[in-house]
Amino acid sequence: MSELFKKLMDQIEMPLEMKNSRVFSSADIVEVKVYPESRIWDFRFSFETILPIDFYQELRSRLVTSFETADIKAVFDIEVENAEFSNELLQAYYQEAFKQPTCNSASFKSSFSHLTVSYTDGKVLISAPQFVNNDHFRKNHLPNLEKQFEAFGFGKLSFDIVSNQKMTEEIKHHFESSRQQQIQKASQETLEIQKSLEASIPPEEIPKPVSNFKERIKDRQAAFEKAEITPMAEIETEENRITFEGLVFDVERKTTRTGRHIINFKMTDYTSSFPMQKWAKDDEELKKYDMISKGAWLRVRGNIENNPFTKALTMNVQNVKTIVHKERKDLMPQGEKRVEFHAHTNMSTMDALPTVEQLVAKAAQFGHPAVAITDHGNVQSFPHGYHAGKKNGIKVLFGLEANLVEDRVPIVYNEVDMDMNEATYVVFDVETTGLSAINNDLIQIAASKMHKGNIVEQFDEFIDPGHPLSQFTTDLTGITDQHVKGAKPISQVLQEFQSFCQDTVLVAHNATFDVGFMNANYERHDLPKITQPVIDTLEFARNLYPEYKRHGLGPLTKRFQVSLEHHHMANYDAEATGRLLFIFLKEAKEKHGVNNLLDLNTKIVDDNSYKKARVKHATIYVLNQKGLKNLFKLVSLSNVTYFAGVARIPRTILDQYRDGLLLGTACSDGEVFDTVLSKGVEDAVEVAKYYDFIEVMPPALYEPLLARELIKDEAGIQQIIKDLIEVGRRLDKPVLATGDVHYLEPEDEIYREIIVRSLGQGAMINRPIGRGENAQPAPLPKAHFRTTNEMLDEFAFLGEDLARDIVIKNPNEMVERFEDVEVVKTDLYTPFIENSEEKVAEMTYEKAFEIYGNPLPDIIDLRIEKELTSILGNGFAVIYLASQMLVNRSNERGYLVGSRGSVGSSFVATMIGITEVNPMPPHYICPNPDCKHSEFITDGSVGSGYDLPDKICSECGTPYKKDGQDIPFETFLGFDGDKVPDIDLNFSGDDQPSAHLDVRDIFGEEYAFRAGTVGTVADRTAYGFVKGYERDYGKFYRDAEVDRLAQGSAGVKRTTGQHPGGIVVIPNYMDVYDFTPVQYPADDLTAEWQTTHFNFHDIDENVLKLDVLGHDDPTMIRKLQDLSGIDPKTIPADDPEVMKLFSGTEVLGVTEEEIGTPTGMLGIPEFGTNFVRGMVDETHPTTFAELLQLSGLSHGTDVWLGNAQDLIKQGIATLSTVIGCRDDIMVYLMHAGLEPKMAFTIMERVRKGAWLKISEEERNGYISAMRENNVPDWYIESCGKIKYMFPKAHAAAYVLMALRVAYFKVHHPIYYYCAYFSIRAKAFELKTMSAGLDAVKARMADISQKRKINQASNVEIDLFTTLEIVNEMLERGFKFGQLDLYRSDATEFIIDGDTLIPPFVALEGLGENVAKQIVKARNEGEFLSKTELRKRGGLSSTLVEKMSDMGILGSMPEDNQLSLFDDFF
């Protein structure tokens, strides 16, 4: 027994007979770890053998009890020399294990503590009943049991569970027997009560039935109110009468076929999450449980059972009640509350959680007068923060946490005029116990003195730091306690090193670190700091070799083949650095003409050195409107000009735009904090002069620095904070306590953990500490939004007065410096095109006169006047003119342009050529230029002008043209005509890039930007992150907890992007920084376009956004026009043969059985999907108006299903009379007699799904007005079901395009099929497609069968759609040819009589570039062999073999073969 252990035995008063026993004869205390803050002493004991169980229990009891008297928690584990044991000892310790915290789970303890264990074949087996022998217990509890036994001294044991059938049967028998006894007992008690009651009733009285139901309910409710709350994490098996309290985060209500209701919901108590199920027998009972809603805090009680469908433990809820959740509150009185100056939102990429709305609302809830936004490197939360501040009545301070870098990082410091070839260099390296020159120690200084490339002298000394080295230091440097033991005093080593370095140039790799450490130690020992020249080989390498990705000592020595045997030992590092130095000097002389030390910083350091410069954080705040614009410029420059891995702001650029901005020192990654940590207060004062205020953060936020051994302990953190405050005092700069907020509540920490860890070890924050399999990243800091009270508690070590100054007084005084700024403008700023108003008006009337004559019909004249008054009066003319110019340019290139949205509601847009849709009431118009007579049908009896019967002009006898879709202008620009027009245009996908460039050409490159988007973590992605975290960090979550964690982790910014067609146009009398910063999409510096930094929706009411979209329809129309020579504008919209497609297949010459569908809708845009084909089958439309209805019904939400479909089936309404498109509501109600304003308002309420959200009073007013005008009840009820409606103008444009395509399908089928396969088909299988009808039908049947069992791939689903068209084409008598090596085109199908020849891209796996290369190569000469085809055509061996198998290559040989006789022929 060691003296130390003997002393401990005396102190805890161990019984004498035990203390003197042989058991403790070789006992020793191996290690004691003391944790003063948490008051824990952790002992590690050593014994010869495993302790008898009574010895262990006595030791544990006395040790714990003795230390408890001093308010210290004592814990221990044991190591033994001989770990032999009997099964009896094993069983005794097994039962002891369940008294330990590691094995104290309620379910594990209750199920396993009474079982028997045995040791067999190197494994401990637990004999258990069948129902607990499962993977859950194996995965979650046996590892804890194994760890506990290791702590007992048993070493590493492996545990497993084996089923004991006898035990299983006995438990079942016991359960049944016990249950039967309970039933019999209950029956007997009931019988005795009944007899007792009968005996007590007088004979003449009729006994009344006894009912104690209400009492039982009351008793149960009382029990529910008083029930003990069980943490969800403790439930691991089926249990009865469990009570939870928690937050509802997901709710789904279902109704069974029998009318019963199921409420499936999920709750969390933040220990875990649980699925719940509550049944309600009818609607009345269901209403009782309205409190079960997302965000509600509930107490629930029920039985935990395995759900047979989800296979998950689920609570069948019996009781439920709402509870009051105790939220954190800021308890300080108003006027004495803090202001958070450092807070991140979910726009901090993959780093923070709250939306800016949540952040601002939380600050307002706390009663804080203001809150700052400081996202990492971006300001994308500004617009929403601006609106949130106004909504919550709180001042929002707009800022960001910038990545500050030096523009030109020097290679040499303290440079002097010196011939580098003649200089003597001391190349040195230091090894330390950490990165802080203030908190860590030097343990080795080594140097090589070199002249003309030769080592002339060396220096190498270890230094004893006066304390044991940590394992981390030893692992990193290879230096052990033995190396430093007995070393010279540090003062002597420093003096000797200074002498060694006299009259030399110092050299180090990452010299700022080494020199900083040396200067701090020189100063500490009253020695002069370094003043001689210092060359940093790290910056030397970065500037000489900017193309290298890594410039660390290790990668450089490998690249230049310099020996480095023991990296991170100073002597080896110094010698390797010296060898590299002379390689660099030679390179600098030969390539840059560098001979003098002064030349290093002037001839080699270039303007791109910022890309490799070390990033330091700084917080930048907007003080006024000028500051806002300057910040927008800085953000733009950092993302566009100075982006390198992250958005960087060079210091000189910040200086250039600093007016109106306020600078803070940021977090532990700021340069002031770093200087205090690494060099001390004196140096930090110089650095801090650049800033306006000093930030200090709660000690908890600096705790990761402890894990990284940058700071020794909690006292060290407190000292750093005091030093930062001292820096502020010396410079008379305010010190503000900030919270570096990344989430709102402490329990949200896990969400950030999941998001951050998903970045992998490549992210700096996830770099493992130490080496080996067990190396883990530093813990993330506690970064929730702290109240004033919590913040004062964090800084209590400073004293009350100072704590209040930095937490309350200074931040509130700082807020007074901030002026109100306008982040989002209130007005629309359209670009300027000279004479745009006159041009729009002129073009409108010119076209109107051309069509309708001069003077115009009153209905036309009034409509134009009404629209132009709105368009010109609100400054919208330039939007119309720009759209017209874009459409006209595309038309000139031979493409039609389709309109989207409601622009077709504007007759002016029709007249100037933006849209083909005519919104006037249905009408006839005479095309005779000498007549131009017109007739309008204004009573609503005709839905579309295309449906008017053919008619001869009553004035001149010319056949009338027909037009007009009856769409009110109000649906485009609002009832008052002042809504910003959103003109969406569908350009051909082939022409879209040209149309985009047209925008630049019209407005100027500096005024046209792609509309920016922000991509956030999607729900499915978040789910993947949670599962990855679970896997990587050894967690196990039940499914409900995974769902909760995924829900909490979703929505965080992940990347940026661009709208597929949206282009934002800045007015040419302003600049983009008046509205938004700019950037490249997804930080792609090679992108052709810059985008708005803000999501374009945030500024869409301030600047013009043109939607220049790409679409297949215009491309298809152009292809058909090229093939046929037919002008698509001449195709009639009422062709009777085309309309037959919607009612049968006869017009195609095929039967329903042959093509598998009752109509001819396959491949027709808008009508070819399964959903719309089903609608067509049910309704059989015969008019253009009915097709518009179908288009509206198919695009709306809750317009067809459960609404119009039922009305048509029940015969209540027809396809023509149901509500189809949004505009029809307004038109119908006006025809019914409602005032236009009310008709418009009702339409707006219905189309946005707000009918049931408005007040009952408002809704009843509309209903009364409709009923007064005889609007049927079914129509009113239909309005109430709608969630979203399609614009009629959009439907009209789409249907018109669809009918043009359908025209070719009916009248020019081979052209149609050629265009369809060239443009619309997404998947091909040429072997099947060219093999004939039987092969095609067989493949379709195969895919259909797979789809029924959800086994068809996405490619097969797309292929099925293609094969439907192939099948139809073949049934109509056309042929699908084989791919032809010498005739097939690269990308387009070719017509050969009645046969289509496929292009090379139709071959699976062959891309467009290879297809074009094949065509190019064959034009240069015939392919003589497969080898030649591979080489010249750029084909893979796999593709060549596939072509060979399909017979495409004929008898082509493998290789070119030459014969002796070749030359004779």
UniProtKB/Swiss-Prot annotation:
InterPro entries: DNA_pol3_alpha_NTPase_dom, DNA_pol3_finger, DNA_PolC-like_N_II, DNA_PolC-type_N_I, DnaE2/DnaE/PolC, DNAPol_HHH, DnaQ, Exonuclease_RNaseT/DNA_pol3. It is found in: Cytoplasm. This is DNA polymerase III PolC-type. SUPFAM superfamilies: Nucleic acid-binding proteins, Ribonuclease H-like. SMART domains: EXOIII, POLIIIAc. Belongs to the DNA polymerase type-C family. PolC subfamily. The keyword Hydrolase applies. It is an enzyme of class 2 (transferase).
